[in-house]
Amino acid sequence: MKRTYQPSKRKRRNSVGFRARMATKSGRNLLNRRRRHGRHNLIDL
């Protein structure tokens, strides 16, 4: 049986990377929320 998590750096960047977050309004909201909170890393890759 194939496992559910098949890691790929490219897929991960495309779905949860900085540019993916900037592409949608909700993603930008998420980044601003993390900035307000004082996160050292905005994107947790």
From Swiss-Prot:
Span list, region Disordered: 1-45
Keywords on record: Ribonucleoprotein, Ribosomal protein
Domain of life: Bacteria
GO CC aspect terms: ribonucleoprotein complex; ribosome
Record GO biological process: translation
Xref: InterPro entries: Ribosomal_bL34, Ribosomal_bL34_CS
Molecular function as annotated in GO: structural constituent of ribosome
Pfam families referenced in this protein's UniProt entry, alphabetically: Ribosomal_L34
Transmembrane annotation, as ranges: none
Keyword presence, Ribosomal protein: yes
Compositional bias ranges of the Basic residues kind: 1-14, 31-45
NCBIfam families attached to this UniProt entry: rpmH_bact (TIGR01030)
Family: Belongs to the bacterial ribosomal protein bL34 family.
Name used for this protein in its record: Large ribosomal subunit protein bL34
Biological source species: Chlamydia felis (strain Fe/C-56)
Gene this chain is encoded by: rpmH
